[in-house]
Amino acid sequence: MSKLGKKPILIPSGVQINIEGDMISVKGPKGTLSQRLSPYIKVAIEENKLWVQQNEESIVRRSQRKMLRTFQGTYWSLIKNMITGVTEGFEKQLEIVGVGYRAQLQGNKVSLQLGYTHPIVLEPPVGVSVEVPAPNVVVVKGIDKQKVGQFAAEVRSWRKVNVYSGKGVKYRNEVVKLKEGKKA
């Protein structure tokens, strides 16, 4: 059994969990998320606790036990993130550092000027919202942790931080260790 799989997930009030076949859906105050479950996993709900268990019936060989433990921990984390997403939501903050580098909103799209000859216009996926509180700060919010992280990584990938000058797009809490330049 995985370390996480031994612990139950507490279901907060205001959250409804529905399990139909191989699909689990979590509904909360911020929205609804659903996830397909592996045939190697069983999900059981007791009162306000959710247990992620290995499906012993799906084992054909003994070598599959290790794989089942990894699935159990992975699905435990996925379901926990779904519950956190529909109750609190997720947020990633990006900082833009550099002269002339800035961001602005155009409707629901974000326009980035990162030193290229043209502005980069990115449209967030469904369920993800973007805010630009300052020209050098981009805030990505949503209920799906995977989509929020993926879109933030996509924004960052257009101009990663230069390790010599420190210019580029970085996460708010990211520490960039600057390298020393060439000495003559």
Curated annotation (Swiss-Prot):
Keyword list, A-Z: Ribonucleoprotein, Ribosomal protein, RNA-binding, rRNA-binding
GO biological process, one term: cytoplasmic translation
Record has ATP-binding as a keyword: no
Organism domain of life: Bacteria
Membrane-crossing segments per the record: none
InterPro entries per UniProt: Ribosomal_uL6-like, Ribosomal_uL6-like_a/b-dom_sf, Ribosomal_uL6_a/b-dom, Ribosomal_uL6_bac-type
GO cellular component: a single term: cytosolic large ribosomal subunit
A GO MF term: rRNA binding
PANTHER family per record: 60S/50S RIBOSOMAL PROTEIN L6/L9, LARGE RIBOSOMAL SUBUNIT PROTEIN UL6M
Protein role: This protein binds to the 23S rRNA, and is important in its secondary structure. It is located near the subunit interface in the base of the L7/L12 stalk, and near the tRNA binding site of the peptidyltransferase center.
Subunit structure: Part of the 50S ribosomal subunit.
Family the entry assigns: Belongs to the universal ribosomal protein uL6 family.
HAMAP family according to UniProt: Ribosomal_uL6_B (MF_01365_B)
Name assigned to this protein: Large ribosomal subunit protein uL6
Species whose genome carries this gene: Pseudothermotoga lettingae (strain ATCC BAA-301 / DSM 14385 / NBRC 107922 / TMO) (Thermotoga lettingae)
